[in-house]
């Protein structure tokens, strides 16, 4: 804690204020923002073309779990020699309209791979941003890097997505 003492007309007054954040504190704060941005960009889902139409697929934690469960079912179909009989139904959206789509094994695996690639790309982008922040040696460099990487703009965009989709996620949770 920092403080000051002031004598004025035989009165003693004090002022106390919190310490300035350290370099590590500043980096940690920015990393929380990057984690938030990354998580939102994963959870917002992805667009995927299927049979000539581009659909939006949500990818919240429940959807990710469902993809994993369906992958197990698809793997079992192959193990049982029933790959050609495999069918998966999945919800895709165009605008505000939801469609139930039917995928055969190969089509579903393509969707599954695309979803994984999208998640991996978002994670990779977050790691690159964190590496750039980690390389900063002073608080001034951190501030400059935040501006260069447009972290504040990315965070605002992520907050807008959270509001639009009603996601229950906050920077403070990261």
Describe the predicted segments one by one:
Residues 2-174:
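A preference for well-ordered globular domain cores
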């Amino acid at each position: 804690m920092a403080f000051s003492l002031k004598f004025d007309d035989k009165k003693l007054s004090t002022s106390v204020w919190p310490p300035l954040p350290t370099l590590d504190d500043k980096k940690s704060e920015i990393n929380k923002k990057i984690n938030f941005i990354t998580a939102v960009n994963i959870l917002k889902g992805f667009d995927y073309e299927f049979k000539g139409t581009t659909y939006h697929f949500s990818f919240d934690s429940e959807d990710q779990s469902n993809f994993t469960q369906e992958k197990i079912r698809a793997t079992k179909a192959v193990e049982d020699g029933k790959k050609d009989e495999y069918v998966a139904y999945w919800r895709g959206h165009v605008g505000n309209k939801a469609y139930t789509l039917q995928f055969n094994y190969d089509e579903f695996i393509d969707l599954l791979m695309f979803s994984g690639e999208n998640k991996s790309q978002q994670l990779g982008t977050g790691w690159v941003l964190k590496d750039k922040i980690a390389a900063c040696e002073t608080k001034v460099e951190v501030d400059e890097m935040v501006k260069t990487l447009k972290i504040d703009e990315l965070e605002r965009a992520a907050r807008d997505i959270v509001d639009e989709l009603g996601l229950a996620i906050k920077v403070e949770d990261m």
